[in-house]
């Protein structure tokens, strides 16, 4: 699930906000939340906000090792769960909101119509039918669309692809290339 977190202890004792850096992640909802936080913190609290580009893995690594950015308003924490728990327990980071987007989830999805028409009820059922999901460049293979480079879900999905031996079962990875490419692949 998504998590919002930042470094602990950023506000000064007199309540003055000062300067903060906020990660502006490379997907639409995170861009929106970062810009909304910027408006609220600048207009409502007099903060000086700098938005810096980010993605889950790179932003977390930078926050963990360098303390920058100060805030990641939407981060897919499941991709960094173990090191995040360690950083929180060592008071380097604090989770401020465990679910900024209620009901958000991460997983592999297929459309309901294809599932129903082909009696696909389990992951094994789907993996056994690459013919239903043709690869855009090689119709003899099933196309398994992964997350863009730099996203934690790309690493997890590629490892699961290997673990389930999907390549041996007629599948080939489709690199979505970007957030927009991933959005465009959804029919």
Role assignments for model-derived ranges:
Residues 28-47, 162:
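Short, polar/charged alpha-helical segment
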Residues 31, 35-38, 60, 81, ...:
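Extracytoplasmic/secreted envelope proteins and their assembly/folding machinery
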Residues 92-145:
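A conserved helix-loop-strand patch within extracytoplasmic ligand-binding domains
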Residues 14-29, 47-52, 141-145:
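Short, well-ordered beta-strand elements
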Residues 1-6:
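Bacterial N-terminal signal peptides
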Residues 34, 52-92, 185:
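Pocket-flanking alpha-helical
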Residues 61-62, 69-73, 145-187:
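Ligand-binding pocket segment of bilobal, Venus flytrap-like solute-binding proteins
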Residues 7-13:
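Sec/Tat signal peptide C-region and signal peptidase I cleavage site
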């Amino acid at each position: 699930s998504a998590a919002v977190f930042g470094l602990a202890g950023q506000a000064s004792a007199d309540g003055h906000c000062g300067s903060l850096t906020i990660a502006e992640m490379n997907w639409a909802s995170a861009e929106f939340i970062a810009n909304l936080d910027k408006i609220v913190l600048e207009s409502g609290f007099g903060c000086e906000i700098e938005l810096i580009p980010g993605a889950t893995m790179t932003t977390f690594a930078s926050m963990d090792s360098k303390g920058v950015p100060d805030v990641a308003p939407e981060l897919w924490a499941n991709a960094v769960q173990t090191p995040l728990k360690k950083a929180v327990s060592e008071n380097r980071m604090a989770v401020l909101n465990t679910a900024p987007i209620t009901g958000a989830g991460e997983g592999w999805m297929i459309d309901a119509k294809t599932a129903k028409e082909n009696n696909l009820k389990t992951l094994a059922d789907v993996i056994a039918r690459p013919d239903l999901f043709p690869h855009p460049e090689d119709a003899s293979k099933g196309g398994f669309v992964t997350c863009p480079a730099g996203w934690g879900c790309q690493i997890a999905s590629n490892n699961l692809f290997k673990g389930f031996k999907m390549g041996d079962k007629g599948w080939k990875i489709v690199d979505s290339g970007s957030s927009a490419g991933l959005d465009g692949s959804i029919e």
